[in-house]
């Protein structure tokens, strides 16, 4: 199965990690291996350049040449999607220092410890759904095709159909508000419950039609009316925000001093979580201003690489419209 996906902000993301010889890096959301490949390539390039320099600096050229062919740097790639793991392994097969593991990035600490690694130099998280997952109709992520209503990244747990057919009207409305800021959430939830009383909702086409009929005609002009609802259900199915909050904390904990955590977000809800978490790590004393001395003992644990998030270049958004909402944030551990 061909895993076609164009990595968003490829060079900006990899550049933010500051790849260095002998470094240990984690691509926590490997997908088809686009970012992973570039990290592995730069790691190989950095180590080769370092070894070349040794040849000229050291009298024992043979020893330096041996070091050039022994790569101490490592790349660990994680993904919860078995199809993505298979694609990443194929993409990275030429890099002996790359390891691909089928696991959710919220378990990054366990995955790294399995390899007897205690700390890393950098972690990258790309929170977007891959083009492969969106375009492969049978995965049930897309509202552009009629397919089984699934949306599971790893084929475990409840599917989108389970949620749509079993959650109460209030639960569905709350989900649409919390995970997508859908202003017509109550209308949509009402119509979903009404429709499922007549026939079980089993396909993306059914759900998309129900949503389209629930919202005003004006709402259907600029964007597909099902866009936000599908986002909210996908987030709920895969417990994305729980995994994000857990993964962020574990990834930062794994970093060496000077290590970097870079995260690419695609919607305001996940970006808010990343922004607030990074801000909490950068915060120093929280004592009231009128306290003569600090009693909280709180010191900053990190600093932002950029004050504001990076966004894709115009050329990228024009060639890949799925990159339009992307934001890249990076924090450096102190």
Regions found by a protein language model. Give the residues of each.
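S-adenosyl-L-methionine-dependent methyltransferase catalytic core, i.e., the SAM/SAH-binding region
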Residues: 1-334
């Amino acid at each position: 199965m061909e895993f076609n996906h164009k990595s968003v902000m490829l060079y900006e993301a990899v550049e933010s990690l500051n790849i260095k010889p002998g470094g240990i890096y984690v691509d926590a959301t490997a997908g088809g291996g686009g970012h992973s490949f570039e990290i592995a390539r730069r790691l190989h390039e950095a180590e080769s350049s370092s070894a070349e320099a040794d040849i000229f600096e050291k009298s024992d050229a043979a020893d330096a040449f041996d070091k050039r062919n022994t790569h101490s740097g490592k790349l660990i790639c994680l993904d919860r999607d078995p199809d993505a793991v298979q694609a990443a392994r194929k993409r990275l097969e030429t890099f002996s220092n790359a390891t691909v593991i089928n696991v959710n990035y919220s378990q990054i600490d366990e995955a790294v410890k399995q390899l007897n690694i205690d700390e890393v130099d950098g972690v990258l998280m790309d929170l977007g759904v891959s083009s492969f997952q969106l375009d492969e109709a049978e995965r049930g992520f897309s509202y552009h095709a009629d397919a089984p209503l699934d949306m599971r990244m790893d084929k475990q747990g409840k599917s989108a159909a389970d949620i749509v057919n079993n959650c109460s009207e209030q639960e569905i409305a709350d989900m649409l508000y919390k995970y997508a800021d859908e202003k017509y959430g109550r209308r949509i939830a009402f119509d979903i419950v009404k429709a499922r009383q007549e026939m079980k909702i089993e396909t993306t086409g059914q759900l998309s039609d129900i949503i389209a009929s629930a919202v005003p005609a004006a709402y259907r002009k600029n964007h597909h009316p099902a866009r936000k609802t599908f986002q909210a259900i996908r987030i709920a199915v895969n417990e994305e925000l729980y995994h994000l909050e857990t993964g962020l904390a574990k990834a930062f904990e794994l970093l060496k001093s000077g290590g970097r955590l870079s995260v690419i977000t695609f919607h305001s809800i996940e970006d808010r979580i990343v922004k607030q978490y990074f801000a909490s790590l950068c915060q120093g004393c929280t004592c009231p201003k009128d306290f003569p001395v600090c009693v909280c003992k709180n010191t900053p644990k990190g600093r932002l690489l950029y004050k504001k998030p990076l966004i894709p270049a115009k050329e990228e958004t024009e060639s890949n419209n799925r990159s339009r909402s992307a934001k890249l944030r990076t924090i450096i551990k102190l």
